[in-house]
């Protein structure tokens, strides 16, 4: 039985995020979101398992997600946050990795003032600890970070890395370059993977569905071509996806990606793109789906 996996979604409690993202003006997502909100969407889309990803640079928030995952059968993996440059980073990583569903870490690179923060030998100790505990690295980056990410990935060739949201290209402006060239360099490294997620919200959320899909399609095609059928994984980025509600919802984004990827990579690739690749990357236990 093939398990279908959403490789990128969030849960949060607004009351615990005072002064943090998402701001109140984003009323579509400025409220609590938990498993009961996502469950009907998963059922309708026949998604079995999700990867729950942090959205605050906070160990308290990460603990909340780990506790929630322990009580939520549909969560197969948690990507959390640890200060990777802390003096005791190795101990913090070990504590995180002790949780049954802990599978990866994500520094919020897009929000840091230094675009080259990741290209730093002070991360070597943290990366060694991640490798010791078989953790993956989620790269929340934008085009301006890609040179530094390339240097980091070359320095740590044994570390499995996945680029979130295709590195958030400037889809609304129609800029393929220099994003495409930078992504091609990254895709040449075998430890680099990519999430097919978050693109509709980069395409101009107020645009209608036809325009958004037309704007997005060249970027989806590029990612499919660069990372192929084994290193690309679909994710919803829910509930952030709600910001692009003018062009559709959870099932619409899934269907659009299925149609496009079947056209460019072939129907045989869909099991990997929509489940198998994320399962292998995050070492997700699928035993409950095999019963």
Question: Residue locations for each model-derived region?
Answer:
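Mid-domain alpha/beta scaffold segments of enzyme catalytic cores
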Residues: 1-133, 161, 214, 250, ...
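Catalytic pocket-lining loop regions of alpha/beta-barrel enzymes
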Residues: 117-233
